[in-house]
């Protein structure tokens, strides 16, 4: 890829005119930091548009080359401008969230196009609408906007504004021309399947809009907001989305909308009016039985008032018998007088239906699910109490269990040893172990244990009562029982699972989703351009100043990196960004940019989203300034970047970009 160097001669709203070292004039995309007289280095990707490059090779002496080239440029520029102005018939501004200005001739062919904000530049570069018919140019712009995610839901509204060049047309021609343009705009929007608003404008308002760096449509809404006392300043008018500013100001009186002009909307509007109840029964009756009297229908249909006026005049007595079938309650009232006819709406049986729904609380017996507490018999731990008999010794009243041992009918002499098992009756299923004492008849010296009932826990110590036949040693382990109680409390630690419910906090109501794609998807690039959309999918508002988003990449040979936010739906001034070098690099990530929000960013409510368009790169690259020799050659290899998405040109769910709230990871997978 070839590189050029040159000097910036002039800055315009969206481009910079540069004189190269080879004495060629080129137009570059305007970027932050550009200044007149500045030396810059650039390549073909930085050109404003390949079709707009104007080259003039110098054939004069080097010492006068600059002046001569500038003179040629000015002469041709003014000549072209004169020709262009003579053809300018009308001006069309399109606000999607990118804003684009088009100039057309009388045949509705686009003769000029320019971006009104930074987001519009790539769209215009791809669409190249110049010399296209207006319909084709707008269709292509809308298609590209959909592909790039600017039109991605039914909530998006496209705002068109148009004005006629008053210097070329008289009033009647202007009126006719604006109507033809509006018709074209409607056709384009409807064929593209988008919602739209069209605001006709004047040449005077267009000039005022240009002075404020606004499209005609946004300026008209701003003026309306000022008139109505709505809180909408110029900054908001520039940066808020079309849907947001339309939500603040009612433009219905001076804009043309795609809202269908159906009369079907009127009944909904007239429902609150008192005559309406009389209208609704009449509508239900008329379609069914008045087919034989079509003459009366048009008389009554114009307005509810005229309809009720006609009710008494054509005594509907012949039709009443017919209507009495389907609606006996309403027609008798209509028979007598129109006042009672309005009252006939009162018997709306829907109230009865509402009452019928009240029995639904019968479903409240769901509390019967409380038996779920039957899970409380978690004595599943009771099988574990094979060791729990030891605690049985803890209630040292070994003598007291003896009376309990009497029920153990197996061998009354042995019950002395059984007292140790007497605690087992607490877990009645355990008595199955009692048959083992039957093998103990061998110790005929059972009377000796009478003196040492406390030592009887020894069988529990062995944990296998089969060894109990050796009670001869029962005298020595007298000290052992004292140890066993010490271990017995250990099982009480089993309740430790209680902490598990701790995680169930209101935090779990906070849920987010991140979608992303990369605007530049080539492997090698001078700057990274991730586009990110953060959506609150939970039930609680999220304080944006507590949110951090991390995009991971390898810096390769690039140095002096900076982050810049080109655009956000909450304004770029509320977005922050820091480039961080990782202390523990990974194979595909040794750095990340951490994107955050200022305190003024406010909160992200459930269902809302924040969209961010960013760039990361060398500080000279982002401003197109000439870098020092040490930074001359630099490129990112995006294929080695962890967060790079080369598979999509639109927003998709992406978990290789992480999101943290108050330092806790809420979304994504770290590298």
From Swiss-Prot:
GO terms for biological process: carbohydrate metabolic process. PROSITE patterns: CBM3, RSGI_N. Gene3D superfamilies: Endoglucanase-like. Anti-sigma factor for SigI2. Negatively regulates SigI2 activity through direct interaction. Binding of the polysaccharide substrate to the extracellular C-terminal sensing domain of RsgI2 may induce a conformational change in its N-terminal cytoplasmic region, leading to the release and activation of SigI2. SUPFAM superfamilies: Carbohydrate-binding domain. Residues 508-671 form the CBM3 domain. Residues 1-57 are cytoplasmic. This is Anti-sigma-I factor RsgI2. One of its GO terms (molecular function) is cellulose binding.
């Amino acid at each position: 890829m070839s590189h050029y160097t040159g000097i910036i001669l002039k800055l315009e709203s969206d481009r910079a005119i540069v004189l190269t070292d080879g004495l060629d004039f080129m137009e570059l995309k305007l970027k932050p930091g550009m200044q007149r007289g500045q030396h810059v280095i650039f390549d073909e990707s930085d050109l404003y548009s390949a079709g707009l490059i104007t080259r003039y090779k110098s054939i004069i002496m080097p010492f006068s080359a600059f002046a001569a080239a500038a003179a040629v440029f000015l002469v041709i520029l003014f000549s072209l401008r004169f020709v262009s102005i003579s053809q300018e018939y009308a001006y069309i501004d399109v606000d999607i969230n990118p804003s684009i200005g088009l100039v057309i001739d009388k045949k509705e062919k686009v003769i000029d196009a320019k971006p009104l904000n930074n987001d519009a530049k790539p769209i215009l570069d791809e669409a190249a609408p110049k010399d296209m018919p207006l319909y084709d140019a707008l269709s292509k712009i809308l298609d590209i906007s959909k592909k790039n995610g600017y039109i991605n839901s039914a909530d998006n509204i496209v705002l068109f504004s148009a004005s006629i060049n008053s210097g070329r047309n008289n009033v009647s021609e202007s009126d006719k021309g604006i109507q033809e343009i509006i018709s074209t705009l409607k056709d384009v929007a409807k064929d593209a399947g988008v919602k739209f608003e069209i605001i006709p404008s004047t040449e005077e308002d267009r000039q005022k809009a240009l002075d404020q760096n606004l499209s005609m449509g946004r300026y008209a809404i701003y003026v309306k907001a000022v008139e109505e006392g709505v809180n909408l300043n110029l900054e908001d008018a520039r940066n808020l989305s079309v849907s947001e500013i339309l939500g603040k100001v009612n433009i219905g009186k001076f804009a043309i909308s795609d809202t269908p002009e159906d009369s079907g909307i009127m009944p909904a509007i007239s429902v609150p009016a008192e005559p309406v109840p009389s209208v609704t029964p009449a509508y239900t009756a008329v379609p069914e039985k008045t087919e034989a009297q079509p003459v009366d229908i048009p008389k009554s249909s114009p307005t509810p008032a005229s309809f009720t006026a006609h009710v008494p005049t054509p005594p509907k007595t012949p039709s009443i018998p017919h209507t009495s079938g389907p609606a006996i309650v309403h027609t008798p009232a209509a028979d007598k007088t129109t006042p009672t006819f309005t009252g006939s709406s009162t018997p709306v049986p829907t109230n009865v239906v509402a009452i019928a729904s009240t029995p639904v609380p019968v479903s409240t017996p769901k509390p019967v699910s409380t038996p779920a507490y039957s899970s409380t018999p978690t004595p599943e731990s009771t099988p574990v109490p094979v060791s729990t008999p030891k605690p049985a010794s803890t209630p040292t009243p070994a003598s007291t269990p003896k009376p309990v041992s009497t029920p153990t009918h197996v061998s009354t002499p042995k019950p002395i040893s059984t007292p140790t098992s007497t605690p087992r009756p607490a877990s009645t299923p355990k008595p199955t172990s009692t048959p083992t004492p039957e093998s103990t008849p061998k110790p005929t010296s059972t009377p000796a244990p009478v003196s040492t009932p406390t030592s009887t826990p020894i069988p529990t110590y062995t944990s296998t009562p089969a060894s109990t036949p050796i009670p001869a040693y029962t005298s020595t382990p007298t000290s052992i029982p004292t140890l066993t109680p010490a271990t017995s409390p250990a099982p009480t630690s089993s309740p430790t699972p209680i902490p598990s419910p701790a995680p169930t906090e209101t935090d779990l109501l906070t849920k987010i989703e991140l979608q992303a794609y990369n605007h530049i998807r080539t492997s090698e690039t001078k700057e990274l351009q991730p586009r990110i959309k953060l959506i609150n999918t939970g039930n609680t508002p999220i304080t944006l100043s507590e949110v951090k988003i991390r995009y991971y990449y390898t810096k390769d040979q690039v140095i002096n990196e900076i982050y810049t936010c080109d655009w956000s739906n909450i304004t770029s001034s509320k977005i922050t960004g820091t480039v961080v070098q990782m202390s523990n690099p990974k194979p595909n990530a040794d750095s990340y940019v951490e994107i955050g929000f200022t305190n003024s960013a406010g909160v992200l409510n459930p269902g809302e989203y924040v969209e961010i368009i960013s760039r990361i790169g060398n500080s000279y690259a982002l401003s197109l300034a000439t870098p020092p020799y040490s930074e001359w050659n630099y490129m990112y290899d995006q294929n080695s970047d962890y967060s790079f998405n080369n598979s999509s040109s639109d927003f998709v769910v992406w978990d290789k970009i992480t999101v943290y709230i108050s330092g806790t990871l809420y979304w994504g997978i770290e590298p």
